[in-house]
Amino acid sequence: MSTPDPALGGTPRPGPSPGPGPSPGAMLGPSPGPSPGSAHSIMGPSPGPPSAGHPIPTQGPGGYPQDNMHQMHKPMESMHEKGMSDDPRYTQMKGMGMRSGGHAGMGPPPSPMDQHSQGYPSPLGGSEHASSPVPASGPSSGPQMSSGPGGAPLDGADPQALGQQNRGPTPFNQNQLHQLRAQIMAYKMLARGQPLPDHLQMAVQGKRPMPGMQPQMPALPPPSVSATGPGPSPGPAPPNYSRPHGMGGPNMPPPGPSGVPPGMPGQPPGGPPKPWPEGPMANAAAPTSTPQKLIPPQPTGRPSPAPPAVPPAASPVMPPQTQSPGQPAQPAPMVPLHQKQSRITPIQKPRGLDPVEILQEREYRLQARIAHRIQELENLPGSLAGDLRTKATIELKALRLLNFQRQLRQEVVVCMRRDTALETALNAKAYKRSKRQSLREARITEKLEKQQKIEQERKRRQKHQEYLNSILQHAKDFKEYHRSVTGKIQKLTKAVATYHANTEREQKKENERIEKERMRRLMAEDEEGYRKLIDQKKDKRLAYLLQQTDEYVANLTELVRQHKAAQVAKEKKKKKKKKKAENAEGQTPAIGPDGEPLDETSQMSDLPVKVIHVESGKILTGTDAPKAGQLEAWLEMNPGYEVAPRSDSEESGSEEEEEEEEEEQPQPAQPPTLPVEEKKKIPDPDSDDVSEVDARHIIENAKQDVDDEYGVSQALARGLQSYYAVAHAVTERVDKQSALMVNGVLKQYQIKGLEWLVSLYNNNLNGILADEMGLGKTIQTIALITYLMEHKRINGPFLIIVPLSTLSNWAYEFDKWAPSVVKVSYKGSPAARRAFVPQLRSGKFNVLLTTYEYIIKDKHILAKIRWKYMIVDEGHRMKNHHCKLTQVLNTHYVAPRRLLLTGTPLQNKLPELWALLNFLLPTIFKSCSTFEQWFNAPFAMTGEKVDLNEEETILIIRRLHKVLRPFLLRRLKKEVEAQLPEKVEYVIKCDMSALQRVLYRHMQAKGVLLTDGSEKDKKGKGGTKTLMNTIMQLRKICNHPYMFQHIEESFSEHLGFTGGIVQGLDLYRASGKFELLDRILPKLRATNHKVLLFCQMTSLMTIMEDYFAYRGFKYLRLDGTTKAEDRGMLLKTFNEPGSEYFIFLLSTRAGGLGLNLQSADTVIIFDSDWNPHQDLQAQDRAHRIGQQNEVRVLRLCTVNSVEEKILAAAKYKLNVDQKVIQAGMFDQKSSSHERRAFLQAILEHEEQDEEEDEVPDDETVNQMIARHEEEFDLFMRMDLDRRREEARNPKRKPRLMEEDELPSWIIKDDAEVERLTCEEEEEKMFGRGSRHRKEVDYSDSLTEKQWLKAIEEGTLEEIEEEVRQKKSSRKRKRDSDAGPSTPTTSTRSRDKDDESKKQKKRGRPPAEKLSPNPPNLTKKMKKIVDAVIKYKDSSSGRQLSEVFIQLPSRKELPEYYELIRKPVDFKKIKERIRNHKYRSLNDLEKDVMLLCQNAQTFNLEGSLIYEDSIVLQSVFTSVRQKIEKEDDSEGEESEEEEEGEEEGSESESRSVKVKIKLGRKEKAQDRLKGGRRRPSRGSRAKPVVSDDDSEEEQEEDRSGSGSEED
């Protein structure tokens, strides 16, 4: 029995209660195990908490089951229909029904879903059924406490608990409640048709209390409120009823508080179902409000099988007789009532059979049978036949579905009951009784209806208006809301964008800062810091470069080690051989200081030999010692003396060194260890007691340990010896110059250079001394030779190879600095050179000075001498690895030690640098391609983009420097010579005279030079002359127009001069540059500034001499024609302190090398060289050691001219040199194409940019040339005086020629020039009939290699003569072949053959060329073709002819040429027009139509090109018709104008064609040499200009075409 729990509001709890056992609940589904109704499960259920899977039967008010409530509805409905609504019983029943739905104070009524989920309980839920004759058969049944409708106890219950149970005050007192309950019970019994017991009747009337009678009331509903604990019933159970075995006996679990068995927890009234707690005693703490979705139980009459047995572990068995502590067994309160009743009816009526019990028993048995059958079916053997097994499976599944079907039916019934009940039906009005309507009511109803309608209409309108207002308001709100939202979003977006922008800016700043820091560390050569930053950035490319650098340097280090080891082994072998020979002879001849036997003719016979007195030990050295030649005679005269053994000084040292090296060689892989001297404890540099010797040790160690990029700690950490330290392992300190050097003291940086050169010698290495020009490379070389002679006892022979122009300078320097050194200047005529042979054979000399030419020519003499040292001045001459000089030196001359002197080691290309290194150290620098690829395209192998950014470029440059550092020493003037005055360079723009402007314009546009017509016997009428090499002609015009002889002759005649030479003012008025010089030179002479004036062209120097003579300037001239012996004299004359010569006129190529002209402080470069290094060399003739004044370099440049392009190209090349490398710019395999494009760009018209090309005025020029304020003021005064003087002159002329001064034949408009050009073309076609002058051919008749070879072998003139003969013979042969055929007999096929041939030579075209068309016809053709080419699509603006201009080559599109037999394009058509192949417009039309048909054949129909070709056909037809119509209407004059234009354009196209195709013509001239074709080269060799070269043309060509190679 359950009692109410006051704390938890009556949460039901399991407890022993009388009853027949658990009510079978609905199962969730079929179970494969035994059914709950089986014998097994019925026999042994154990009490415990219910399973969560079993539903709780919902209960009605006061604990009545829900089905009773539904039964109560039936009488209520019948009473309502009979009109008994006023009956008090009806109201009571209605109140009870309402309570079942819930009143105020009991929470809201349950929703239909809740009702549905609660379902309807089984009638077998409790043992106290109305018709049950026995109270209970449980383990402990006894008198119970009855409970009322609210779940409160009827008697003896705690009022407080009751108050808590109902959760609110009640209007009834206890007696009224008892009476009400009794009335309800009585109504139920009456509704079932059962008699009312007497005590119930009395309780209904309120006469007697109810509780004592409760056990005897069979229909009393089970209590619905649980007690505080599962206490036992107070009395023993009457043993008058017991179930048979297997139907629930003592082992059955006692029913729950509401007659619900354990496993089906009851539900408190008016609330949702409550779950059972998990443990047996934990229900006190269980929450009362936790909902649990429950499955509704089976309807009445369908008993469910008993719940399955709960395992003992999950629900411990509760003994039936246990009682809670503190709850004593209460005596039954019913005893007095029993006694009183027994007095009235002493014999109790026997109870009848309860049909419900019988039904229940029947159900149990059915369930048992079903469970048994399921078990049988489950245990069937697996060997059954297939059909039997199928039937058994069907039966088993059907039996398992029983509970599911029952549940489904129950849910259907529940839904039907709910939907048909009075209170829950949809239409409540259907149950009302209709009322009869009277007439008055109808009227009233009508009136009310009208009022209602009016009211409804008003309300509708009002509602509609409110609706509209609400819509409008909503629109406003909507807009406002979205405006605010948009504003917020915009603010947010702006904030986010600002945030990201700030973040990005910060990130960018940080990246820039890191990059700057990286660059700073890179430039500061902080390798460790730079590598750290690279690791932080994770830049793979930079890391890859560094890794490559390390690998390459490691390889080179190993190669250097091997080279040095090989040299040491060679030396040792030689010495052993020598010792063996001496031992074999048995006697030791007089040994010279170099360890070799001496004789009278020995080259060291005049050097002192150290001798020692045997007894006293006195040593005689220097002047006291005997000469090597008279040693034996001296020893005879001075007995007791003998030659001092070398072991005391050099020999022992060298032997020890050899032994040490021998020991060190086998262990090259060991980690580097410091030498013995360095292992000595070096004092702390910061301490005070550091002696001078210690300080020197510290500095030496620091100097040796520090490489260019690696600190020694890093090098040691990596286990690598520093690359530089390996190369210069043997160090020797040089503090002062040799005693043999007199007449001057070396500067400190020159001493350092000497030390580096000595280090190269000691380490068996060769190198490049690349100090900037003017730092004294010659002096340092002389210092090395004297040092080796004095300290190393190496007296030569030394071979010094120099340019002819500097040979006299070298001889002068030797005489000045080392007069004791015996030198031979090997030069002159063959007879003079032969005179030196005896001296050379005797070896009585130390140094031989000679030139490149004689090295090659006289190799049979010079190569026989075993040279100790080979020194090449201007070493960049060796930059071509295949040049004759390099090959001769490598193959014929024996010189283990080599030294190159150069001021420009890295000119333009990387292979050139490799060639120098390969010449010096062939064992280390073997492969050019590896070297070039490593520096040129480091990323070519990785697949990444090859272009390099600035940082990568600097890394590459630095790794190149790193490779070069042991072998190359380069110091700049600004670094080593602080006392050297600065050098300032200005580019001064010069204007053109009117004559220059006219000539320049026509030469640039048409490639023609205007003449006065005298060459055609049309003197005065004017004419044109087509010249080759347009750029060269443009440069000449910029320099001076009188460089063209016929122009000067014509002008001299025009101006009234005789002899064809212009003199006086008009010399400088004709040229802008000369006019500028005329303003500058007087000022420089007035302020005692000596001037070096460098020109490219010797003919210009001649004109300048005329000008100097006119102005009275004293000058000296040196060019390629100046003899070598005269050069020294010229230098001496100019450098004399009181020399009257203030201008030295030099050619850039001949006078730019190796001359000391430091007495001059102004350098004027009249015209720039293509190679900027030539100009730099020229500048450094003045800016060199010994210069006292600030040097001004004035570079003259004509505005808006080709000179500006040359200057730009030179600057670009210089930039390449400064950086050493820019990726991709070295690999100039396509240089011919680039050169062609560059020439074409120069020849095209460009817009004049006046602002940029401003010609400086007098004041600006004065600022450029003045060294200080006083000079500037003087120059300004001189300008003022000059202007005043000119103003006073009555015959005053402007400083530059103007157009009105020019003769009429030179002032021609473009049309006239075109006409004259066309006439000249015609004359060329038909022949002039008179002899023609020999034309100067400015193209190279020889290739670079051939020319260089000719220069080296001295056979230039013979080879050129041979080429000329071959040319003429070939021409004669061609003329004889062409003789029989005439233009008139040539056929169409011949035309095609001619058209396919390319013009193979310059000059006059072949005689068989077709006769020209009439100019008018040519004009028409050009006009038609131009119109077709220029036609554009009106919609897209696209030029249709773009793809038809030039066909792709056969290599690019071979399939086109396979398909199309006669390919033609507009370029070919234009060429045929120029060559007069078309004799009529019909011929032209055929080719244009063929072009379009070819396009239509090759391309798909409907493609863009196909459609374009159709359009072009129609365009051609329409243009032709239009032009023919115009032609008919035009007059004779217009025809003549067209003729002039046509001929002009023809000549223009011819000249451009000739200009652009220089490379092709060079190939053609190669063929003239008997068809010998040399393999093509990626980069052509730069020609060597011989200083003996006297031809002006060669000089000009070198400056023009030769310089294109740079």
Swiss-Prot record:
Main location: nucleus
Superkingdom of source: Eukaryota
Domain QLQ: 171-206
Location of this chain's protein in the cell: Nucleus
Description of how the protein assembles with itself and partners: Component of the multiprotein chromatin-remodeling complexes SWI/SNF: SWI/SNF-A (BAF), SWI/SNF-B (PBAF) and related complexes. The canonical complex contains a catalytic subunit (either SMARCA4/BRG1/BAF190A or SMARCA2/BRM/BAF190B) and at least SMARCE1, ACTL6A/BAF53, SMARCC1/BAF155, SMARCC2/BAF170, and SMARCB1/SNF5/BAF47. Other subunits specific to each of the complexes may also be present permitting several possible developmental- and tissue-specific combinations.
Listed PANTHER family: SNF2/RAD54 HELICASE FAMILY (PTHR10799)
Name by which UniProt lists this protein: SWI/SNF-related matrix-associated actin-dependent regulator of chromatin subfamily A member 4
Organism lineage: Eukaryota, Metazoa, Chordata, Craniata, Vertebrata
